Amino acid sequence: MACGATLKRPMEFEAALLSPGSPKRRRCAPLPGPTPGLRPPDAEPPPPFQTQTPPQSLQQPAPPGSERRLPTPEQIFQNIKQEYSRYQRWRHLEVVLNQSEACASESQPHSSALTAPSSPGSSWMKKDQPTFTLRQVGIICERLLKDYEDKIREEYEQILNTKLAEQYESFVKFTHDQIMRRYGTRPTSYVS
């Protein structure tokens, strides 16, 4: 099969090559105005939970020639903290929606279906302290990975032993069939 690639000519050459009566179409010029992804500074901020803006350190591009810096432990901690709080809000909304669906399916109104933010059940949202340190999270992840690896290793050994037993049985059956074919129904003797 043949494969080809074409390149669009740069804009500065188009004016020289294309005359007004040319049958070729001209390139579309971009419209003046703001780009679709950017909004003017006086515009209102986007509603929460729809778009998330990255931290200031990630928004600004690094100047050319400078090294890309890795995030500091504090930045990692802040990112994990933000993700955890988002996860908690998401779980809380999921619980509230499940409770409201259960109440709607029962056709009985419950006043406790939707908990108010001031109720004691949602006090965990007020506390924004981490449950685990970064080191503890690393240790937990290592332990989970080790357990998962051990489980996979056991399953692999079990499957391998099963296949080996099947292969041995087929070998014994094949050998028995070959012996029966060769010697038939003759009585076996110790002298050959």
From Swiss-Prot:
This is Akirin-1. Residues 17-71, 104-127 are annotated as: Disordered. Residues 50-60 have a biased composition (Low complexity). The modification Phosphoserine is found at residue 22. One of its GO terms (molecular function) is transcription coregulator activity. One of its GO terms (biological process) is negative regulation of satellite cell differentiation. Widely expressed with the highest expression in heart, liver, placenta and peripheral blood leukocytes. Molecular adapter that acts as a bridge between proteins, and which is involved skeletal muscle development. Functions as a signal transducer for MSTN during skeletal muscle regeneration and myogenesis. May regulate chemotaxis of both macrophages and myoblasts by reorganising actin cytoskeleton, leading to more efficient lamellipodia formation via a PI3 kinase dependent pathway. In contrast to AKIRIN2, not involved in nuclear import of proteasomes. InterPro entries: Akirin. Its main location: nucleus. 'Akiraka ni suru' means 'making things clear' in Japanese. The name is given based on the presence of the clear nuclear localization signal. It comes from Homo sapiens (Human).
